[in-house]
A protein has these predicted regions:
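Cell-envelope/extracellular polymer assembly enzymes that use nucleotide-activated donors
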Residues: 7-11, 29, 39, 212
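Conserved nucleotide-sugar donor-binding catalytic segment
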Residues: 10-13, 149-163, 168-248
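Short, well-formed alpha-helical segments that are part of the catalytic scaffolds
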Residues: 17-32
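Acidic donor-binding segment of Leloir-type glycosyltransferases
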Residues: 28-71
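Glycine-rich, basic loop-to-helix element that forms the pyrophosphate-binding segment
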Residues: 72-89, 110
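Short aromatic/hydrophobic "clamp" motif used to bind/position activated sugar donors
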Residues: 94
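The conserved acidic donor/metal-binding loop of glycosyltransferases
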Residues: 98-102, 127
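Conserved donor NDP-sugar-binding/catalytic core segment of glycosyltransferases
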Residues: 106-162
Length: 303
């Protein structure tokens, strides 16, 4: 572990349907960062399974001074869960992490350097590598127990990378990009707690809690940057393409774009264009939608 003059909190929500093996790998990847976190806030979004609670007990036993558990009595969704987590963090810098992804070992160190170099920075993320289950998970997932040596669950060694999602790095480019798409990779975000709270924290915006928050922060004049480096291995599969389609998904997208337009973030032509693109993508068959998504990722990988 390397020492650093800036402290940060990790914020990770978890709910009962999470795979305990994935959860443990995700948590270890953050606790074993090259610059270790001062605090690890786990928000339990409603009652969990015994297997997930066993992982939490193991984390508390190993890192009793850092791990802080916030338990919500019922499942409220990721927006309210993250809002509760932000309020519970004791440090101003917060590293967001999903409960089924794997952070690169120097992710947080790179972001701390980024924040130290730009005192005006309030929001930052980086590239993500989307991956499928590696051989370790295929071999161990079914028989894994909480007593599996943690060295075996830290880093994906031969995972199948299906694509890399890169984003514009500079503030001006992010402002332009945000008018069409989410400008940050949520699972790789580091943010300033005071800035997030000043614009009202996370809200219950189904499927876009992060994007809606970023837009409010950008509208308030907060600075954002992205690193070109891959910071997180993000897990794909598990019905991702199905969740990104259908009439309900199209309606949610239109509702979000309408909100952006009414708030003054989008012009009317941008609003119409965004809605048309999202509706068209939502009604495509799953296979075609998945093909186009992977094609776009491959183009990014070789750009």
């Amino acid at each position: 572990m390397r020492s650093f003059d800036m402290k940060y909190s990790v914020l990770m929500p978890v709910y009962r349907k999470e795979n305990p093996f994935y959860f443990y790998r995700a948590a270890l990847s953050m606790m074993k960062q090259s610059v270790s976190p001062d605090e690890f806030v786990l928000v339990c979004d409603g009652p969990l399974t015994e297997e997930l609670d066993a992982v939490i007990r193991k984390l508390e036993e190993t890192w009793s001074e850092q791990v802080k558990i916030v338990r919500l009595p019922e499942n409220r969704g990721i927006g309210p869960a993250l809002a509760a987590g932000v309020e519970s963090c004791r440090n101003n810098l917060i590293a967001r992490m999903d409960s089924d992804d794997i952070a690169c070992p120097e992710r947080c160190e790179k972001q701390l350097v980024q924040f130290r170099g730009n005192p005006a920075l309030a929001l930052a993320s980086g590239a993500i590598a989307e991956f499928e289950m590696d051989s370790l998970e295929k071999a161990a997932n079914m028989q894994w127990t909480i007593d599996t040596p943690k060295e075996l669950v830290e880093i994906p060694e031969d995972c199948c990378i299906t694509g890399t999602r890169t984003l514009p790095c500079g503030y001006e480019e992010i402002l332009i990009f945000a008018r069409k798409r989410n400008p940050m990779n949520h699972m790789a975000v580091m943010m300033r707690r005071d800035a997030v709270l000043s614009v009202g924290n996370y809200r219950a915006v189904k499927g876009a809690e992060d994007y809606e928050l970023w837009v409010r922060m950008l509208q308030a004049g907060y600075r954002a940057e992205n690193l070109p480096d891959v910071l997180v291995y993000a897990r794909t599969g598990n019905g991702m393409m199905q969740r990104r389609g259908g009439l309900a998904y199209a309606k949610e997208n239109i509702r979000l774009q309408t909100h952006f337009y009414k708030s003054g973030f989008l012009t009317f032509p941008e609003y119409i264009s965004n809605c048309a693109v999202r509706v068209a993508a939502s009604i495509l068959p799953v296979g075609i939608r998945g093909y186009l998504y992977q094609k776009k990722l491959r183009e990014r990988m070789h750009a």
